[in-house]
């Protein structure tokens, strides 16, 4: 699964819309409150690690590094 689709699946799983996610990111982390900006980053694959961590946080998730078996 592409990272873009995976992130969108997490958003849907949490019962949120892109607008709600962007509003929370803007409120908590000072992101632009523009859905097209987030959508563009997901489409281009240009989301920075720090942005991914903030996105995970507003969705109620932690990014975890796990050693492969």
Model-based region annotation:
Residues 28-47:
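Recognition helix of helix-turn-helix/homeodomain-like DNA-binding domains
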Residues 2, 65-69:
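Short hydrophobic/aromatic patches at helix-to-coil boundaries
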Residues 1-20, 24:
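A short, Lys/Arg-rich alpha-helix, primarily the initiator
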Residues 50-64:
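DNA major-groove recognition helix of helix-turn-helix/homeodomain DNA-binding modules
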Residues 8, 12, 26-32, 66:
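Catalytic phosphate/metal-binding cores of nucleic-acid and nucleotide-processing enzymes, i.e., regions
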């Amino acid at each position: 699964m592409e990272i873009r689709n995976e992130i969108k699946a997490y958003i849907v799983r949490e019962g949120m819309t892109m607008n709600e996610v962007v509003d929370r990111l803007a409120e908590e982390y000072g992101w632009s409150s523009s859905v097209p900006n987030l959508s563009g980053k997901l489409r281009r694959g240009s989301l920075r690690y720090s942005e991914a961590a903030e996105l995970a946080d507003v969705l109620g998730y932690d990014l975890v590094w796990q050693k492969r078996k």
